[in-house]
């Protein structure tokens, strides 16, 4: 598979803005046409830096909403390898341990790769690899309520810790890094991941890129 046959789509926006939902919708609908082995999803969270050398007390103090918390260079390298036809081993990140695990997930080359993550559009080198990009423009208060519910139910967090993190880093970093990166998006999606018109537009764009 050569680089011209690999379409990379990025879905960015605040935490809990609907990125995963629209990514799953696109994945489920396109795999019927392309086949499951020809489309893949990469979550930016997998590229949080390894913190196994730090104590748990130190790990919880990390600002996970700052671009420096992520190894975007490794993500760029993996995308370049996938575009050139090589498989990669994607790290696995533990939200409860706040570091990578010893496991990896192997991804083989795909016709379509969907990236999803909060800070994807902040990195110029990543943007150069994208064929199309989306920003989920969901109101921040709605994102916070969704995040609070999700992190307590699915990620072993306490309500107090989620609220504290939101005040200290999530909201400030959104305003400093994530929201300004909206200017680089090709498509801005209001009303979250259930926006059917936006989903259809993105699917059409992917199909057009594949037909080139």
UniProtKB/Swiss-Prot annotation:
Q: In which pathway does it act?
A: Pyrimidine metabolism; CTP biosynthesis via salvage pathway; CTP from cytidine: step 1/3; Pyrimidine metabolism; UMP biosynthesis via salvage pathway; UMP from uridine: step 1/1
Q: What is its EC number?
A: 2.7.1.48
**Pfam families in the record, alphabetically?**
PRK (PF00485)
Could you tell me the keywords of this UniProt record? Answer: ATP-binding, Cytoplasm, Kinase, Nucleotide-binding, Transferase
Where, subcellularly, is it found?
Answer: Cytoplasm
Instruction: Please give the name of this protein.
Output: Uridine kinase
> What enzyme category does the UniProt record give?
transferase
Species of origin = Shewanella sp. (strain W3-18-1)
Which InterPro entries does its entry note? P-loop_NTPase, PRK/URK, Uridine_kinase, Uridine_kinase-like
Q: Give GO cellular component annotations, separated by semicolons.
A: cytoplasm
* Domain of life per record: Bacteria
State the gene name recorded for this protein: udk
């Amino acid at each position: 598979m050569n680089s011209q046959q690999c379409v990379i789509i990025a879905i960015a926006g605040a935490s809990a803005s609907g990125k995963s939902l629209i990514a799953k919708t696109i994945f489920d609908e396109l795999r019927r046409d392309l086949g499951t082995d020809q489309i893949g999803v990469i979550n930016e969270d997998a590229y949080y830096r390894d913190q196994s050398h730090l104590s748990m007390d130190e790990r919880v103090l990390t600002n996970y909403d700052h671009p420096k918390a992520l190894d975007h260079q490794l993500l760029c390298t993996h995308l370049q390898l996938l575009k050139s036809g090589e498989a990669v081993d994607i790290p696995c990140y533990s939200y409860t341990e706040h570091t990578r695990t010893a496991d990896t997930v192997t991804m083989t080359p795909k016709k379509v790769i969907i990236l999803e993550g909060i800070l994807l559009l902040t990195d110029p080198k990543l943007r150069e690899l994208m064929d199309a990009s989306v920003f989920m423009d969901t109101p921040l208060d709605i994102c916070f309520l969704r995040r609070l519910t999700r992190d307590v139910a699915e990620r072993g967090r306490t309500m107090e810790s989620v609220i504290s993190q939101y005040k200290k880093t999530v909201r400030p970093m959104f305003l400093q890094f994530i929201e300004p990166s909206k200017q680089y998006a090709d498509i801005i999606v209001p009303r979250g991941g259930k926006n059917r018109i936006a989903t259809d537009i993105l699917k059409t764009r992917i199909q057009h890129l594949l037909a080139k």
